Amino acid sequence: MRKYIQGAFRQFCFLMIAPLLIAFAGPAAFAQLTKVGKGEGRVDIVAWPGYIERGETMKEFDWVTKFEEATGCMVKVKTANTSDEMVALMNEGGFDLVTASGDASLRLIAGKRVQPINTSLIPSWSTVDERLKNAPWHTVNGVHYGTPYMWGPNVLMYNKNVFGDKPPTSWNVVFEPMNLPDGKPNEGRVQAYDGPIHVADAANYLMYHKPELGIKSPYELNQEQYADALDLLRQQRKLVSRYWHDAFIQMDDFKNEGMVASGSWPFQVNLLASEKQPVASVIPVEGATGWADTTMMHADSEHPNCAYMWMEHSLASNLQSDLSVWFGANPAVPAACTDGRGMQTAEGCTLNGLDDFEKIKFWTTPVSRCKSQDECVPYYRWVSDYIGVIGGR
């Protein structure tokens, strides 16, 4: 209880900056670097867990040490478990870069917390997947606010001992009360994500099972569609034992606390499988939401030269290749799948869903002025109402 109340409090604090979501006036004026100079000796990065490794978790996964040796820029990482936490940290300041998902990136741009980047200072920009170069979650009015980093789906992780030879095919195992294949109820044995963006997972489920609602995008909901999504989440609340936002706590819950099904990231699935835990994952028939993360530079970066050096380094195909294996996700640089510079292979990228880009409903920030209908429920409502759902209201 304490953990998800703390998460709700962080999300409530975000309401203070919610007006930024209502409109975006256009890119602010920033003095872009015209050349990369000598490094300042340090770069401070806000990142998702597992995104920036220096061999401390597993020694073969290290893309920090050689960068530090080559540039003299010491990498300091602050992990964040939700997009709202990332936005809050960037608002506080003191960081150079952030690996932001689409439900954070546009907020950071609108709030002028990140600056446009000069792609001519990033030689590896030309190697970026064409599907990502002009993606709307980091490109506004033709201006780029970051370099793509990694992308992938939110998967349904499950316990193989519980599901046996009947792996789940639908998200209903975490949304609807039922007995699982082991004959026991799912109540108290499933989890849900501790973040308002989980409303989109409910909407995605309804897109498939209630087509009469007319949902075109899980991030663009009118009042009726939104109300149905909240009702589904309230039903789910009765089933959920814990709302997760810490990847490592979720892994412990699957190992030691009897959790058997939850939305998750490939990162947790891969680590648990490496520990010989009986877990696997699927993308169910309803499809999945997902994330495409961008390395963005703080508007007040104190170490801009090191920041640009890191953005270039982050697109190296060997780093992209190893990160793709480590996180179970897809590289922003397609050559990372085939050039043999890292651990990843073409088969591995296919397994991670490289060809499923069009099937994933990528996280983005819900706004009132939406494309699919006249008016949609904006994100600040998602924040306040999801706090209510978690609190049992």
Q: Which sequence ranges carry the predicted segments?
A:
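Conserved C-terminal helix/tail region of periplasmic/extracytoplasmic solute-binding proteins
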Residues: 359-393
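Early extracytoplasmic/lumenal segment of secretory-pathway proteins
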Residues: 30-108
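A ligand-binding cleft/hinge motif common to bilobed small-molecule-binding domains
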Residues: 104-107, 263-278
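Extracytoplasmic ligand-binding site segments that recognize negatively charged/polar headgroups
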Residues: 48, 52-59, 99-249
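Bacterial N-terminal signal peptides
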Residues: 11-25
